[in-house]
Amino acid sequence: MFLLVGLGNPGKEYEKTRHNIGFEAVDKISYEYNIPIKRERFKGVFGDGRISNEKVILLKPTTYMNLSGESLREIIEYYNIPITNVIVIYDDVDLEVGRLRIRTKGSAGGHNGIKSIIYNLNSEDFIRLRIGVGKPQRDMVSHVLGKFAKEDEKNIEEVLKIIPELAYTIINQGPQEAMNKYNNFRAE
């Protein structure tokens, strides 16, 4: 069983912001594999289904970003999901818009949602799928809570389009194969 988590903030005012790209990515997977995300529990909304022959749970924590780890801890404990089968999708300001980076472990890199997950799981050994949202030209909070510039929207759509295939690759062929295939991806 795999847990795919998209990070974001709840509420209409945060929709389509850079910080909510994880929610959008999980919505894309939900649509592509017909896994509705409608059940409310574990401090989030989730749904379960299959990608290929693997059972998967899709989760969008409804805590704010800096408390995301609480939601993950609850669902992981309930379903007894191995931490190495957890895939967290989130925004990364250190990657340019349209870039992807997959890692199997590591530090939080300054991301408060990832800090919360590492703290609550007491582990860094989960898979991270980072989506580039670009460096801020002004302060960080305004940047991540802001919407994408018109010229960036095409690149973001291109990235979101390949997310379901990327998730399939991680689940069926492993994270190393996904890294080989997608870590050099650049939306043009």
UniProtKB/Swiss-Prot annotation:
The keyword Cytoplasm applies. HAMAP family: Pept_tRNA_hydro_bact. It is found in: Cytoplasm. Its main location: cytoplasm. InterPro entries: Pept_tRNA_hydro, Pept_tRNA_hydro_CS, Pept_tRNA_hydro_sf. Hydrolyzes ribosome-free peptidyl-tRNAs (with 1 or more amino acids incorporated), which drop off the ribosome during protein synthesis, or as a result of ribosome stalling. Catalyzes the release of premature peptidyl moieties from peptidyl-tRNA molecules trapped in stalled 50S ribosomal subunits, and thus maintains levels of free tRNAs and 50S ribosomes. GO terms for molecular function: peptidyl-tRNA hydrolase activity; tRNA binding. GO terms for biological process: protein quality control for misfolded or incompletely synthesized proteins; rescue of stalled ribosome. The record marks D91 as: Stabilizes the basic form of H active site to accept a proton. The keyword Cytoplasm applies. The lineage of its organism: Bacteria, Bacillati, Bacillota, Clostridia, Eubacteriales. The active site is at H19. TRNA binds at Y14, Y64, N66, N112. Gene3D superfamilies: Peptidyl-tRNA hydrolase (3.40.50.1470). Transmembrane segments: none annotated. Monomer. This is Peptidyl-tRNA hydrolase. Keywords: Cytoplasm, Hydrolase, RNA-binding, tRNA-binding. Belongs to the PTH family. The gene is pth. It is an enzyme of class 3 (hydrolase). It catalyses: an N-acyl-L-alpha-aminoacyl-tRNA + H2O = an N-acyl-L-amino acid + a tRNA + H(+).
